[in-house]
């Protein structure tokens, strides 16, 4: 991920973040229905605000000039956020997507992006899931239906360097 982020920033390509909501006590108090994935994340405190699980690694923190969309609550970085508006304001139609988790958030964001008319490329080695089976399902079965390309970080960096040369 760091190589792709560095190459995009060096090339002047706008970097966007679509982060998961960092949970706080009381977030689900008045919700009638909570998706199983949200219940699991809440019980594990996967994205708990102010905790280790709610922080980015320092090398992946947004930098000045990066754009951070509203946090999403379930899976898609587009659902109930301003990501689509932020991208359209910049005239962006092609997206390079990477991040976690391949079979949930990444896949849902890729699907939603395709539905909205974006050309989506996924960075194969800049994502992860909980198992090999989930990675296979995401990268070999589901995401190819929506992403224009699934490339390695090295291929992405090479393509960026060729396009700006």
Predicted regions and their residues:
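Catalytic-core segment of enzymes that process non-peptidic bonds
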Residues: 17-27, 32-33
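Active-site-adjacent betaalpha module
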Residues: 6-11, 28-29, 33-165
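Short catalytic helix/loop segments, enriched in acidic residues and glycine
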Residues: 1-2
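RNA substrate-binding interface of SAM-dependent RNA methyltransferases
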Residues: 12-16
